[in-house]
């Protein structure tokens, strides 16, 4: 519920949850509806929420989890699939690269591609930590950045 409220606040489209994965996209279904900056800000807020809940659970002696977030920007194929039960989904290299950003990241951090960095590098209130080129499974070496609030 908390993550859904965050993406709605930032005009980002929740695509689906699969197991422990939460997929969302900016610029869908209308490319003018939201931007790379919107999804970066949503990602930082989601990370903070999960961090707060983690701290609360650990203090209460309960199991807790961490969250890695990966972002990439680019074209996707979007559509509705299904015959009896319909679902909106997205596909393409951009989706795969975003998944590699997530898997190549670190818990509690928002990892972005060079493409996303180019779109948000001048957004006030953000700071970036270059990671250099990092090997990403099936993608080779990709330039990555961690993003934080300034």
Model regions and ranges:
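Cytochrome P450 core scaffold surrounding the K-helix E-X-X-R motif
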Residues: 80-82
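Cytosolic regulatory/linker segments at or just downstream of nucleotide-handling modules
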Residues: 76-78, 104-150
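Glycine-centered flexible beta-alpha turn that most often forms the glycine-rich phosphate-binding loop
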Residues: 22
């Amino acid at each position: 519920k908390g993550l859904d409220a965050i993406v709605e606040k930032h005009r980002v489209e929740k695509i689906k949850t699969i197991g422990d994965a939460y997929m969302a996209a900016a610029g869908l279904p209308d490319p003018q509806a939201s931007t790379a900056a919107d999804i970066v800000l949503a990602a930082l807020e989601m990370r903070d929420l999960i961090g707060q809940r983690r701290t609360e659970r650990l203090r209460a002696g309960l199991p807790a989890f961490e969250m890695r977030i990966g972002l990439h920007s680019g074209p996707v194929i979007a559509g509705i699939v299904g015959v009896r039960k319909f679902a909106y989904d997205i596909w393409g290299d951009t989706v795969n690269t975003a998944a590699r950003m997530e898997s190549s990241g670190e818990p509690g951090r928002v990892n972005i591609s060079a493409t996303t960095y180019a779109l948000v590098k001048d957004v006030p209130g953000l700071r970036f930590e270059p990671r250099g080129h990092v090997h990403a499974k099936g993608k080779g070496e990709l330039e990555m950045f961690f993003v934080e609030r300034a």
